[in-house]
């Protein structure tokens, strides 16, 4: 192995980073990149004036070498024994592994390294890297440290554009298979913009993409005082000014940055007030020292004599840093363990010996106690409640933790997880409003009414930390990462133009190839889009950015104001819609999955609805799921979201026909680069030139054929109202709430039909009926926490129309209620008995009413809410008094009126049934015939003649001889004269034998024969004897 001089710019970059306390990024291309990690680490060790920097080594599955030290020694001895040991080749890496503190970590376990700090981070297996992992691992590197990304050998960096990433398998669905790697292209292009980034090969040659470092110069050496920035000097002055103010001075001495010191001062200000009506909300990005500031504040609260302090967090394991700084604060305040306080650790192995309680007994008994976020009822005696990582706790639980005591809360925003948006969007916004209301000056008229409210009103203080603890401000790697993953787009631009009419705005299709091409103009537009996303949604993850860029089924639309023809700049974005095309799954795939109880990735609505209704045909329909609608914060609630949705629906219904003969076609795949085209050391990477326009009018692109539009969102009254107004119908409501927001996921659908088709389609009506039936049954279980108004809003849906239900019959009524039940109802309707006597019948009455089986029974909104609350949610009148906001006496009056109406309807059903049973005289209705009288007579004559002919024919064919009457006229005259005029029977002599005689003769002869045979048999027997 021959020696080679390493490019001096690599050493200068590392040394400058150490001097400025800023990180450096190296991308090493080549299979032997691991060997160059040793050289880079060696350079870093020489540049720093402290212990050997620790290393975080992240990988997917196979490390490529053994991390086990004993195993490595055995392998070394084996090589010595075989005589294959090459000291020059093997030694450097062996020595590096043996002498360096390396933390090996699988990518799927990187959440465990949060809060740790390393001097160097190595990321191998590029195909497993996701934006989340990149942000999570890079964030752990301290100032002056190195981030090293290892790539396999390739002849051109453009080959990375077509690398299949592991996450791409999740983006593919049965109908959409072709993934385009736009994110990788943008990642490679962004490396050129990072001043602290070097792309090198595995021989440490600098590649042309890093040409910006051609003129890199080493920084002149600085004294410790010269290296301090203005904020460091201000922090030093603050610490000196507070030396005489105790216990604040010693606590501020523990702070690392000016921001952190100011946050601790704000906390101590809240503690020293002792009004117990303040909320201090601390928000910051990762690595800004939030937990440390909270820990120091708790130590300050103990010093100020607070007795009951409660700390909550998603898990006690997350509070290591907080309690570490509580004890550092105690040390600064000269508290001694065992003498002044004792520490109690958890015995639960899951919590990793986390601190759960601290008992302080220096002056009087004081406790710092961990409680679970769900145990808000235990806060009765609390004086201070500290909520760490509040964004990771469900919003309803955080609200329940607020009470008549001092509250400190800290939350991460702008981090890779993007969790803090739920806190800042919803909770802090509500606290701001409450705080503003309490500050309103009370006039003479409202003084009495607001006294009680002001007594319970809370004051909100907001603190944010900008400066990082680990590295110096202005870190180039942080800026590169924020730009690449659109993390730092919280500061949304205010729109200076007026509000255009929603009807005048137009929807445009955004071409993703152009959006992610890393051109300056498209980058500005992308940052604007992501700023809207962050400002209008509670959870945004960098992984969403990769899905938006690479997933083949996702499409992006934006609503823009009318643009004057002379305008050259990009217009302001009013709203963004992200749509995911779903469905077109084969029936066989669905049947296989339903039978095994498994669902494929993607296609959220088809799989969920198919599973819920056990319908294998629904997945075959093609649909579009609205993933996000993000409206500019200045323009929310003005109708722009509804306008964007309306235009999107019209587009997919085919109302914007594409009239151009030559449709603008976007390439479905990026052209691969042949290996002979250009060498790695000569290649120049620039954004593509031959790109289509960024924005297309809807009539410039043909729409996909869709059967329905759908949406899945966290149910809130405001969102439900928005989607119902847009014509959507609920078909699914998840029974368990979301872990982060505490909201139930709701799926709503709308069929895309022509204008003349008013009905919503047979399958949607069937789904809606089934959903309503099941929802009514579940209202007393999982959905009993819903307010009656929200539940009523879900049940009542004008978009489906009121189905024609058959009126309630007497048989159905008798199946539900006995005659005695109806008697009880009637007694209550006359105010003769108490309402408790009929409570057992209210669930049945409620159910048949909300299933539209009570015909035209009309109830007001308040009556419907009351019936639903008592009958289906099984709530007490006291609970409903708060929720419906009416006094209980008024509620009982409404309830009595409901029962009166029901009794009246039941009586009508019974009366109608009795009326039908009674025989009513029917009037004969005479109607004139169409035929004339002569035609009618002719027809009757013909019928008679034909009938007569048939009868005559029958008589002719019959033998009637036995009916002939004998005797001539003389004999008849003689007999008649003898009988006289009054005789009723006469007899005439006939020559025919009588029937009886004729019948007896053969019988007698038969008897004689039988006797003769019997006599003969007897004679034979006698002879034999």
Curated annotation (Swiss-Prot):
<dbReference type="GO" id="GO:0032040">
    <property type="term" value="C:small-subunit processome"/>
</dbReference>
<comment type="function">
    <text>RNA cytidine acetyltransferase that catalyzes the formation of N(4)-acetylcytidine (ac4C) modification on mRNAs, 18S rRNA and tRNAs. Catalyzes ac4C modification of a broad range of mRNAs, enhancing mRNA stability and translation. mRNA ac4C modification is frequently present within wobble cytidine sites and promotes translation efficiency. Mediates the formation of ac4C at position 1842 in 18S rRNA. May also catalyze the formation of ac4C at position 1337 in 18S rRNA. Required for early nucleolar cleavages of precursor rRNA at sites A0, A1 and A2 during 18S rRNA synthesis.</text>
</comment>
<dbReference type="InterPro" id="IPR000182">
    <property type="entry name" value="GNAT_dom"/>
</dbReference>
<dbReference type="Pfam" id="PF05127">
    <property type="entry name" value="NAT10_TcmA_helicase"/>
</dbReference>
<feature type="binding site">
    <location>
        <begin position="629"/>
        <end position="631"/>
    </location>
    <ligand>
        <name>acetyl-CoA</name>
    </ligand>
</feature>
<feature type="modified residue" description="Phosphoserine">
    <location>
        <position position="984"/>
    </location>
</feature>
<feature type="binding site">
    <location>
        <begin position="287"/>
        <end position="296"/>
    </location>
    <ligand>
        <name>ATP</name>
    </ligand>
</feature>
<comment type="subunit">
    <text>Part of the small subunit (SSU) processome, composed of more than 70 proteins and the RNA chaperone small nucleolar RNA (snoRNA) U3. Interacts with THUMPD1. Interacts with SUN1 (via N-terminus). Interacts with TERT.</text>
</comment>
<dbReference type="GO" id="GO:0000049">
    <property type="term" value="F:tRNA binding"/>
</dbReference>
<dbReference type="GO" id="GO:1904812">
    <property type="term" value="P:rRNA acetylation involved in maturation of SSU-rRNA"/>
</dbReference>
<feature type="modified residue" description="Phosphoserine">
    <location>
        <position position="934"/>
    </location>
</feature>
<dbReference type="GO" id="GO:0005634">
    <property type="term" value="C:nucleus"/>
</dbReference>
<dbReference type="GO" id="GO:0002101">
    <property type="term" value="P:tRNA wobble cytosine modification"/>
</dbReference>
<keyword id="KW-0597">Phosphoprotein</keyword>
<dbReference type="Pfam" id="PF13718">
    <property type="entry name" value="GNAT_acetyltr_2"/>
</dbReference>
<dbReference type="GO" id="GO:0032211">
    <property type="term" value="P:negative regulation of telomere maintenance via telomerase"/>
</dbReference>
<feature type="modified residue" description="Phosphoserine">
    <location>
        <position position="987"/>
    </location>
</feature>
<dbReference type="InterPro" id="IPR027992">
    <property type="entry name" value="tRNA_bind_dom"/>
</dbReference>
<keyword id="KW-0007">Acetylation</keyword>
<dbReference type="InterPro" id="IPR033688">
    <property type="entry name" value="NAT10"/>
</dbReference>
<dbReference type="GO" id="GO:0006417">
    <property type="term" value="P:regulation of translation"/>
</dbReference>
<feature type="region of interest" description="Disordered">
    <location>
        <begin position="990"/>
        <end position="1025"/>
    </location>
</feature>
<dbReference type="GO" id="GO:0000781">
    <property type="term" value="C:chromosome, telomeric region"/>
</dbReference>
<comment type="similarity">
    <text>Belongs to the RNA cytidine acetyltransferase family. NAT10 subfamily.</text>
</comment>
<dbReference type="InterPro" id="IPR016181">
    <property type="entry name" value="Acyl_CoA_acyltransferase"/>
</dbReference>
<dbReference type="GO" id="GO:0000154">
    <property type="term" value="P:rRNA modification"/>
</dbReference>
<dbReference type="GO" id="GO:0006473">
    <property type="term" value="P:protein acetylation"/>
</dbReference>
<feature type="domain" description="N-acetyltransferase">
    <location>
        <begin position="558"/>
        <end position="753"/>
    </location>
</feature>
<feature type="modified residue" description="N6-acetyllysine">
    <location>
        <position position="426"/>
    </location>
</feature>
<protein>
    <recommendedName>
        <fullName>RNA cytidine acetyltransferase</fullName>
        <ecNumber>2.3.1.-</ecNumber>
    </recommendedName>
</protein>
<dbReference type="InterPro" id="IPR013562">
    <property type="entry name" value="TmcA_N"/>
</dbReference>
<feature type="binding site">
    <location>
        <begin position="636"/>
        <end position="642"/>
    </location>
    <ligand>
        <name>acetyl-CoA</name>
    </ligand>
</feature>
<keyword id="KW-0819">tRNA processing</keyword>
<keyword id="KW-0539">Nucleus</keyword>
<dbReference type="Pfam" id="PF08351">
    <property type="entry name" value="TmcA_N"/>
</dbReference>
<dbReference type="GO" id="GO:0008080">
    <property type="term" value="F:N-acetyltransferase activity"/>
</dbReference>
<dbReference type="GO" id="GO:1990883">
    <property type="term" value="F:18S rRNA cytidine N-acetyltransferase activity"/>
</dbReference>
<keyword id="KW-0012">Acyltransferase</keyword>
<dbReference type="GO" id="GO:0030496">
    <property type="term" value="C:midbody"/>
</dbReference>
<feature type="compositionally biased region" description="Basic and acidic residues">
    <location>
        <begin position="997"/>
        <end position="1018"/>
    </location>
</feature>
<dbReference type="GO" id="GO:0042274">
    <property type="term" value="P:ribosomal small subunit biogenesis"/>
</dbReference>
<keyword id="KW-0547">Nucleotide-binding</keyword>
């Amino acid at each position: 192995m021959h020696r080679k001089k390493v490019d001096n710019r690599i050493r200068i970059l590392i040394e400058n980073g150490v001097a400025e306390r800023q990180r450096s990024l190296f991308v090493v291309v080549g299979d032997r990149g691991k060997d160059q990690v040793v050289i880079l680490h060696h350079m870093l060790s020489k540049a720093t004036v402290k212990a050997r920097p620790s290393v975080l080594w992240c990988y997917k599955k196979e490390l490529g070498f053994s991390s086990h030290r004993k195993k490595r020694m055995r392998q070394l001895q084996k090589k010595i024994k075989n005589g294959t040991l090459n000291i020059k080749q093997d030694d450097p890496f062996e020595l590096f592994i043996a002498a360096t503190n390396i933390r090996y970590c699988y990518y799927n376990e990187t959440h465990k390294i949060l809060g740790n700090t390393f001097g160097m981070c190595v990321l191998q297996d590029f195909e497993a890297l996701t934006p989340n992992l990149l942000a999570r691992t890079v964030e752990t590197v301290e100032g002056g440290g190195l981030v090293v990304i290892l790539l396999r050998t390739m002849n051109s960096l453009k080959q990375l554009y077509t690398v299949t990433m592991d996450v791409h398998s999740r983006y593919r669905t049965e109908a959409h298979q072709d993934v385009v790697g736009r994110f990788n292209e943008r990642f490679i292009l962004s490396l050129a913009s990072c001043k602290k980034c070097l792309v090198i090969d595995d021989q440490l040659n600098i590649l042309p993409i890093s040409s910006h470092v051609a003129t890199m110069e080493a920084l002149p050496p600085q004294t410790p005082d010269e290296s301090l920035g203005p904020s460091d000097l201000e922090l030093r002055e603050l610490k000196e000014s507070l030396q005489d103010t105790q216990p604040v001075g010693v606590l501020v001495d523990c702070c690392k940055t000016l921001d952190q010191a100011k946050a601790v001062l704000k906390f101590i200000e809240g503690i020293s007030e002792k009004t117990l009506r303040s909320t201090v909300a601390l928000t910051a990005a990762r690595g800004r020292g939030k937990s440390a500031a909270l820990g120091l504040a708790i130590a300050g609260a103990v010093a100020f004599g607070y007795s009951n302090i409660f700390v909550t967090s998603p898990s006690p394991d997350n509070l290591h840093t907080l309690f570490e700084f509580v004890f550092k604060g105690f040390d600064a305040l000269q508290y001694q363990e065992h003498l002044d306080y004792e520490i109690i650790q958890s015995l639960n192995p899951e919590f990793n010996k986390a601190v759960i309680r601290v008992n302080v007994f220096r002056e009087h008994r004081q406790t710092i106690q961990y409680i679970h976020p769900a145990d808000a009822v235990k806060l009765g005696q609390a004086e201070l409640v500290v909520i760490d990582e509040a964004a990771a706790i469900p919003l309803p639980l955080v609200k329940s933790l607020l009470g008549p005591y001092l509250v400190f809360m800290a939350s991460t925003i702008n981090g890779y997880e993007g969790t803090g948006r739920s806190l800042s969007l919803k909770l802090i916004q509500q606290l701001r409003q409450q705080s503003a209301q309490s500050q309103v000056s009370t006039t003479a008229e409202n003084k009495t009414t607001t006294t009680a409210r002001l007594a319970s009103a809370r004051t909100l203080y907001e603190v944010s930390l900008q400066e990082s603890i680990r590295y110096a401000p202005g870190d180039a790697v942080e800026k590169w990462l924020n730009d690449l993953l659109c993390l730092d787009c919280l500061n949304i631009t205010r729109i200076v133009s007026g509000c255009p009419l929603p009807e005048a705005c137009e929807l445009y299709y955004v071409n993703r190839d152009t959006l992610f091409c890393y051109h300056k103009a498209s980058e500005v537009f992308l940052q604007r889009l992501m700023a809207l996303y962050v400002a209008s949604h509670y959870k945004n993850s960098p992984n969403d950015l990769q899905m938006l860029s690479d997933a083949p089924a996702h499409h992006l639309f934006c609503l823009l104001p009318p643009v004057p023809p002379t305008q050259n700049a990009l217009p302001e974005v009013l709203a963004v819609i992200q749509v995911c095309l779903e469905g077109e799954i084969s029936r066989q795939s669905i049947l296989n999955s339903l039978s095994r109880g498994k669902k494929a990735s993607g296609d959220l609505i088809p799989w969920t609805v198919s599973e819920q209704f056990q319908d294998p045909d629904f997945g075959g329909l093609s649909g579009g799921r609205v993933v996000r609608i993000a409206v500019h914060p200045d323009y929310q609630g003005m109708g722009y979201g509804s306008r964007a949705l309306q235009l999107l629906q019209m587009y997919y219904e085919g109302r914007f026909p594409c009239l151009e003969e030559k449709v603008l076609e976007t390439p479905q795949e990026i052209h691969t680069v042949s290996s002979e085209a250009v060498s790695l050391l000569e290649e120049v990477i620039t954004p593509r030139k031959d790109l289509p326009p960024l924005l297309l009018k809807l009539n410039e692109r043909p729409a996909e054929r869709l059967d329905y539009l759908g949406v899945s969102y966290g149910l809130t009254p405001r969102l439900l109202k928005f989607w119902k107004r847009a014509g959507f119908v609920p078909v699914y409501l998840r029974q368990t709430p979301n872990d982060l927001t505490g909201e139930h996921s709701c799926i709503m659908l709308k069929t895309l039909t022509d204008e003349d088709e008013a009905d919503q389609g047979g399958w949607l009506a069937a789904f809606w009926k089934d959903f309503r039936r099941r929802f009514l049954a579940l209202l007393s279980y999982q959905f009993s926490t819903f307010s009656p108004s929200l539940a009523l809003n879900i049940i009542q849906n004008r978009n489906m129309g009121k189905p024609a239900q058959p009126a309630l019959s007497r048989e159905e009524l008798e199946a539900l209620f006995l005659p005695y039940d109806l008697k009880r109802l009637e007694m209550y309707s006359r105010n003769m008995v108490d309402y408790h006597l009929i409570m057992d019948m209210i669930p049945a009455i409620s159910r048949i009413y909300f299933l539209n089986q009570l015909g035209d029974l009309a109830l007001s909104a308040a009556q419907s809410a009351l019936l639903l609350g008592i009958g289906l949610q099984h709530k007490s009148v006291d609970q409903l008094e708060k929720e419906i906001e009416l006094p209980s006496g008024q509620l009982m009056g409404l309830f009595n009126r409901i029962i009166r109406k029901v009794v009246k309807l039941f009586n009508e059903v019974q009366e109608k049934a009795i009326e039908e049973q009674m025989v009513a005289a029917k009037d004969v209705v005479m109607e004139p015939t169409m035929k004339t009288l002569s035609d009618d007579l002719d027809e009757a004559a013909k019928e008679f003649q034909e009938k007569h002919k048939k009868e005559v024919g029958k008589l002719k064919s019959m033998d009637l001889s036995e009916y002939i009457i004998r005797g001539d006229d003389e004999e008849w005259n003689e007999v008649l004269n003898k009988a006289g005029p009054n005789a009723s029977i006469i007899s005439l002599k006939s020559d025919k034998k009588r029937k009886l005689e004729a019948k007896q003769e053969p019988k007698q002869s038969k008897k004689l024969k039988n006797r003769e045979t019997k006599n003969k048999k007897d004679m034979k027997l006698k002879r034999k004897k």
